[in-house]
Design a protein with these regions (language model features):
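Hydrophobic or amphipathic alpha-helical targeting/insertion segments
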Residues: 60-80
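Beta-turn initiation residues at beta-strand->coil junctions
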Residues: 1-6, 20, 26-32, 47-53, ...
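Short, small/polar residue-rich loop motifs at catalytic or cofactor-binding pockets
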Residues: 10-12, 31-33, 58-60, 135-137, ...
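Extracellular/periplasmic, surface-exposed regions of secreted and cell-surface proteins
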Residues: 208, 220, 224-233, 238-260, ...
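Short, acidic, Ser/Thr-enriched surface-loop or helix-capping motifs
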Residues: 19, 40, 67, 144, ...
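Conserved small/polar residues in nucleotide/adenosyl-binding loops
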Residues: 290-295
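Short, ordered secondary-structure scaffold segments
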Residues: 88-155, 258-289
Length: 296
């Protein structure tokens, strides 16, 4: 709409250019500098440069490296788009095995060997450089026999580690997620989320345990059609939200002690809509009632 009153492509248009192989080699978003992209013979992005990088005296470029299976293995900055001279590695990725444990940052007891072979074909580790410093974040991923992430171990900037372990249900949904946080010179903290499901695999309850104390974060109830009927927060009836639907299962209302909302489609104050679009809505917080007809 703004372009119609002020025909300025740089401010109001999304612009793209392509090469002979139909690859996007240049793009410009409204109000931003243009981005250049360079590809290799396998059509993989190998260099890119945005307006901020172009403004630097060194003319930085982002570079990308891949393995034989076209998986990203390294990315960072360099000073030209012909060779990776002046390289500053920002992110590295490792796949298939845990041979990375011999490298600095991974060669300690917090990162375990895994001889199960479950990591074959999957991302097993990554190293990320903290911008503006020489610090790095080391992360390892461990998988179960079904290829699901069972454990993640990550170093943190406080001299410790964050370990996340997930146990799954038979249908591949998380049953428990345990997060252990360690910091140099301070006690270890452990928290656990527990998820309960009904016979149809719909989420029924989320519980949180910290310091041995378990609380209920949310309870969910469903109607006979599987639609969310109510949600109670922190096990309290006063923090309960109920949901209403029409015969087409379009959401028509949310009601609770602190917030109420009604949605209108082919009725209400707005122009009637019969395609599922909302024509108007009303919502109430406390004693104040607001009305908002749809702009369309």
């Amino acid at each position: 709409p703004m372009y119609q009153s002020s025909a300025n492509l740089d401010l109001y248009a999304f612009q793209y250019k392509y090469d002979g192989r139909n690859r996007c080699i240049w793009k410009k978003l409204p109000g931003a500098g243009y981005v250049e992209m360079v590809y290799d013979n396998a059509d993989r992005l190998v260099f890119s440069q945005d307006g901020n990088q172009r403004a630097l005296s060194t003319g930085n470029w982002m570079y990308y490296k891949y393995d034989g299976l076209n998986r990203l293995t390294e990315q960072g900055t360099c000073t030209n788009k012909v060779t990776t001279s002046g390289t500053n590695v920002l992110v590295q990725h490792f796949y298939d095995s845990y041979a990375f444990r011999s490298q600095a940052g991974f060669n300690n007891s917090n990162f375990l060997d895994d001889a199960s072979g479950n990591g074959k074909g999957a991302l097993t580790a990554s190293v990320a450089t903290v911008l503006g410093s020489s610090n790095k974040i080391y992360t390892a991923y461990y998988y179960d026999i079904k290829g699901r992430v069972a454990k993640t171990v990550q170093s943190n900037l406080l001299g410790g580690y964050d370990v996340t372990a997930t146990i799954y249900t038979f249908t591949d949904k998380p049953a428990t997620v345990t997060h252990t946080h360690t910091t140099s010179g301070k006690p270890t903290r452990t928290e656990m989320y527990t998820y309960s499901y009904n016979h149809a695999d719909r989420l029924l309850k989320v519980e949180h345990t910290l310091g041995g104390t378990k609380i209920t974060l949310a309870d969910y109830a469903y109607d006979n059609l599987g639609r969310l009927q109510s949600k109670s927060l922190h096990g309290s009836a006063t923090n309960k939200l109920t949901y209403a639907y029409n015969v087409r299962s379009w959401l028509t209302g949310i009601s609770g002690s602190k917030f109420t909302q009604n949605l209108y489609y082919n009725n209400g104050n707005g122009t009637a809509k019969y395609n599922g679009s909302i024509s108007s809505m009303t919502w109430k917080a406390g004693c104040l009632l607001y009305t908002s007809p749809s702009p369309r």
